[in-house]
Amino acid sequence: LNSINGRRTEILKACLIAGENDRGLFHLTVPTGGGKTIASLAFALKHAVRHQMEHIIYVIPYTSIIEQNAQVFREILGQDNVLENHCNVDYGDSEELKPMQLASENWDKPVIVTTNVQFFESLFASRSSKCRKIHNIANSVVIFDEAQMLPLEYLKPCIAMMENLMDFYRTSIVLCTATQPALDSIFDQHRRYIELCPNINEQFKFFKRVIYENLGIIEFDTLIERLKTEKRALCIVNTKKCAQQLYEQLSGDGVYHLSTSMYPKHRKKILAQIKERMSDKSKSCVLISTSLVEAGVDLDFNSVYRQVAGVDSVIQAAGRCNREGIEKKENSKVYIFDINGMKTVPGQSLQSSITKGLLQDYHDISNLECITEYFKRLYHFRENDLDKKNIIGEFKDWKYNFETVSEKFHLIEENTRIVFIPIEQEAKDLLFEIKNQGYGKARMRKASQYCVQIYNQLFDTLYGAGIIKEI
């Protein structure tokens, strides 16, 4: 038990035993590195066999984690038993892959890996093409990975839908995370859950690999100077603009930059360069990024700098530091800071201010008590925003306004436009194909690897200046 693999095995065994439980609500609260992906799959398989359930559905916030997890599941369960269903997956037009294309439309495979957006928007949809999957969600084990990532504005409707699936569709729900949100107050007061991870407090102490240090408010130049002295460091800031400014100031050998302003293919290329550089222990590497590296990116740094954000985000960032526990935790620091004069990201100021308050009260913000307190405060202050568009109201008094709900329910708000960037030759060839042969599904999925999303205001400016053209 005093080794990482020993602890992972303990958690895995506990999940297998718990698989014999009746259908219902389960939590799997496992610290980073505790093997929650395999443990949750083991629980789901045992539970599905016990109750003759038909599918295991993994619901994940980021496509980057989906691709990673789906590959793990394929290695265990075989290629044909796992279906990825999200915007970046491409089953092409070949006869060989047609069954997978059809399966992706109605989720007709034993294990389905999908996004929060695909899952919930199918359930709240009014179009038959979106609703085709619903009969295959019934009698399934549904696992929400990184459950704390459910958008606050839709939290109550999402929880209400989970309860509906458990009560009427013979479905079991697993909320899986290292930072379990305090959802008891939102679920029905009579709803009970079973925790799958044994001895949670002890597990969190064992897997603690870093020391948190609060730097408070610092100057931009001070941050630059600190990063210049680091050999292997990751710095995560809250805006793309700030990330770009830091990168430009630091720019040099071994300094890298990642943000969603770069199209997916470009990001993958940069990640490959970073991994190659980090494989040589003698070389320095400093990465400046936005929060996109907090999940699904397999990188390991000696130090992590995280601009103040929600406690869950800070803990996610800490997961990129001393990942395998090889270094002493005293030598693996996570520095929390804010930059003097830097504006707070719209919609994130409450999360940041709650974290600042908790940094005064708790020496270690990864403490389970601190995590629970963070979510309690967040849900208390945002109580009136947890169903911001009154989705639940549309189902009261025997009203079933699915068309209205479908128009209201968008986990990703539609205030952005997609821009295709044909810099690489493959993208230019693809653009030529689209112009001459039209928008096929497979072509559009390939095109998504060369696309970025920009806000409407910026789009209008660029379009007006003739920088962006319509295809």
Language model region names:
Residues 1-26, 374, 397, 414:
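ATP-dependent helicase/translocase motor core
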Residues 22-44:
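Walker A/P-loop
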Residues 45, 53-76, 89, 182:
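Conserved Walker A/P-loop ATP-binding site and its immediately adjacent core
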Residues 55-66, 226-251, 255-258:
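Conserved strand-helix element at the start of the C-terminal RecA-like helicase core
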Residues 63, 83-97, 238-241, 255-272, ...:
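Conserved helicase motor
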Residues 78-124:
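Inter-Walker segment of RecA-like/P-loop motor cores
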Residues 166, 221-228, 241, 245, ...:
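C-terminal helicase lobe and adjacent C-terminal extensions/tails of nucleic-acid helicase motors
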Residues 172, 176-228:
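Interdomain hinge/linker at the junction between the two RecA-like core domains of SF2 helicases
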